[in-house]
Amino acid sequence: MELSEIKRNIDKYNQDLTQIRGSLDLENKETNIQEYEEMMAEPNFWDNQTKAQDIIDKNNALKAIVNGYKTLQAEVDDMDATWDLLQEEFDGEMKEDLEQEVINFKAKVDEYELQLLLDGPHDANNAILELHPGAGGTESQDWANMLFRMYQRYCEKKGFKVKTVDYLPGDEAGIKSVTLLIKGHNAYGYLKAEKGVHRLVRISPFDSSGRRHTSFASCDVIPDFNNDEIEIEINPDDITVDTFRASGAGGQHINKTESAIRITHHPSGIVVNNQNERSQIKNREAAMKMLKSKLYQLKLEEQAREMAEIRGEQKEIGWGSQIRSYVFHPYSMVKDHRTNEETGKVDAVMDGDIGPFIESYLRQTMSHD
């Protein structure tokens, strides 16, 4: 890349950031941050823990936007200063470093713009992600477990914290189901792109004849709603609460008493399990919160369905069908059927590199809104 081209790219980035700044209202956001931090410094701040956590989350979200912009602008200013130095005295190694910075910077701007677009009413929330294997016994249970690992690795790379709240191992290998609580800013905003059916094609390690098998697993994702977001009353007569002994994933704490909780909500048919906490009381509280989140999501989807009917739209809400195929044999390819995004780097995808699929889907849905 010639120096003149490097300069054109730097100038373009400066223009992009100026345009982004115009839509951000940074001064107002910084004022809000100051107000939130004054609230957080008050001695009675933690009297209402739910309200306190809400303020902390809002403050962190604003700081992510403001600091994200300032970091990008500082990087562009540094690149500009380096270019000026190269004009005064050329240095081949410095030029190579600057060229690489210019190339890498585009991805950083794209990622930041995507964060700004995640402005849905619940995008900033934590996420509850569930995996269930399709028919096919051990083969599909192993596939669900592979997806479980894929999402764990993706979340690690994004800086999200993952808590396994329910885990049911498969008969021979894999899992029959798993429920994850994923904590982090915009966790739901990103992971909502994964809701649907995932298809695997491979030579089965469980088939002595070495035949090719197709397996399916479903992924469901809902926001983890804060208590003050949910206007749901649950009639005690509508639920059954059962206790059972926690099974636990490998290496996790396994209770010797029946501290795990299963709540069945009969009107909706929703069943939630929680075995992450060490006490039955805490597991029950966590399970009730999860049940409320599921019922509230159900209510929101019903409202969205009604609005779609009013507008005459045929937009499917809910699980939908197959969203992505992972082909290990006879060739290597992962393809998203909603966006046609694809890659031959199957191992990287299974190691959590699903960002391009998520971002492609989010940009497509945002452009259609």
Swiss-Prot record:
Keyword Methyltransferase belongs to the record: no
Residues where N5-methylglutamine is found: Q252
Keyword match Secreted: no
SUPFAM superfamilies: Release factor
Main location as per UniProt: cytoplasm
GO MF, any single term: translation release factor activity, codon specific
GO cellular component: cytoplasm
Keywords: Cytoplasm, Methylation, Protein biosynthesis
Annotated compartments: Cytoplasm
Record Pfam families: PCRF (PF03462), RF-1 (PF00472)
Top-level taxon in the UniProt lineage: Bacteria
Record InterPro entries: PCRF, Pep_chain_release_fac_I, Pep_chain_release_fac_I_sf, PrfB
GO biological process: viral translational frameshifting
Post-translational modification: Methylated by PrmC. Methylation increases the termination efficiency of RF2.
Known function: Peptide chain release factor 2 directs the termination of translation in response to the peptide chain termination codons UGA and UAA.
Additional facts recorded: The gene for this protein contains a UGA in-frame termination codon after Leu-24; a naturally occurring frameshift enables complete translation of RF-2. This provides a mechanism for the protein to regulate its own production.
Family the UniProt entry places it in: Belongs to the prokaryotic/mitochondrial release factor family.
Entry protein name: Peptide chain release factor 2
Record organism: Staphylococcus aureus (strain MRSA252)
Gene designation: prfB
